């Protein structure tokens, strides 16, 4: 399949960005624990996630289970359904059949039970996000230790005939912190059509490199550290031979698959210098950036339109110029129109410029257009 064909077939869903950065919070089916803790150091700061622990009525800490990779895929499908309904603030009504269709799963009784179980786990299992702080400049939502998050609320509406369940509809609503991030554009595009067909470990690897390689064509990581990044902490994965065997299966699944910013063309395993581990090298062919056919006058006109709608700022102007040069004019104007409509509806609680920055990148990625930005998700914009 060519780059152009991949771009035409691209179907992107906007997932909440924290979820994509921490997809490791979803365990594989082999995980037997009733809770789990994950930590990651960034500079001098430690971020920590605790899944499946809560206090009972007597104040005792209890374990209630963990979220697993199939639940992650259902969550992304819910993001897709929510967006298709116009991004409502309240409950969304759907059905298990629609959920299966969005995930491209063959319908059947066993699948209905599986999807119900995943919806319940997204509703019932708490997550503590420790060390995540509010940052006013990019509207990063704080999730505190004493405020555990459950991804969704859900209500099942079952129709029965002669004691047999013949239809199951459900209503869902995102946690208010997840919903606010979605509305603010604090999101990461995801290829639901790809992840829905991957095995569990391949899903974790795919989502990890899709985030890390957003602005890279190559990425190398030692297998031990990679498995730590993915939350794969089973005793078997302490041994390089087990990690290698798992990754060899992943390579068969992932090579040639489209990421959101290009095609994953190669994954190779090479021994480290001390021969005690091996490096995993990922190579991406980025989607080709369209050659700009705009004159200087056309670029200036588009920049002026963006400044009229979004405001003027020295930092913003460089972003506007890059967008004007690399993005089709009709796409820019569509994104500006959407931004104005979102503001009128009261959905934008941050700045218009930042919302536009997120949205234009999403629209471009959905069409396979590389905008040539060194940073993404609004990092180049003043937020007012």
Locate the predicted segments by residue.
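Charged, alpha-helix-forming regions
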Residues: 1-298
